[in-house]
Amino acid sequence: MTAFAAWALYALLTRRWLAAASLACLAGLTRPNGVAVAAAVLAAVGCALWRTRGRSGPRVWAAGLLAPAGWLSYVLWVGVRSGDPLGGYFAVQKGWTSRFDFGKGALVFVRDMLGGPTQFGFAMALLITGAGVLLFALLVCGERLPLPVLAYTAVLVVIAVGGSGFFESKPRFLLPAFPLLLPLAAALTKARPRAAILVVTALAGLSCCYGAYALTLARMAI
């Protein structure tokens, strides 16, 4: 999904509407949070239509229709497989206790976690999610970025933060949100080479250790 997203954003920035929509469609077929790529395309399409007062070419309109088709097809396919074309996907999510409640469940989980002993994986999930929110705030408040990039990142952050029932998996939901690294990358360009190397090495080491722990020692699903 991340590759589809990166190239879709590039296609949007270069006004290759059908290529961007096709990649968004494929992203929606790979993972449910691929809807973020479709959201980026729809944001760009909406902006283009607003600027031209609806007089954009047929490719812009086609992109708006094609972009969410992959995600909608995925949802319908899950529904058909579960016996309820329209509600089956959401029933499956409910069965996994996965739901979107604007972060209420996550806040309750954090409150309970801070009130007593907790597993290392949960603590890391909280740390990574908090860092993601902070980086998103820096992204929004920093230099002006293209609307598709902001829309894509915002949807991924909202899904990760606002969802409940999968707290330990929140870092995985943020994996495709690579624009969150732009503020850090900008800061590293202004740092001394030794400091930049030290920061990158430390982050890479932390990522490697946490990944090894999550795959081998953690007693929880990621």
Stretch-by-stretch model annotation:
Residues 6-19, 188:
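Membrane-interface transmembrane helices that cradle and orient dolichyl/undecaprenyl
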Residues 64-68, 190-220:
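Signature aromatic-anchored transmembrane alpha helix within multi-pass, membrane-resident enzymes
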Residues 168-188:
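Hydrophobic/aromatic-rich transmembrane helices and adjacent perimembrane loops
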Residues 1-7, 27-39, 170-176:
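Multi-pass, polyprenyl lipid-linked donor-dependent membrane glycosyltransferases
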Residues 112-115, 119-146, 156-160, 178-184, ...:
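Hydrophobic, aromatic-rich transmembrane alpha-helices
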Residues 26, 34, 38-133, 148-153:
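Membrane-lumen/periplasm interface segments of specific transmembrane helices
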Residues 12, 26-33, 81, 161-163:
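Transmembrane helix irregularities
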Residues 151-169, 205-220:
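Transmembrane-helix signature of polytopic, lipid-linked glycan biosynthesis machinery
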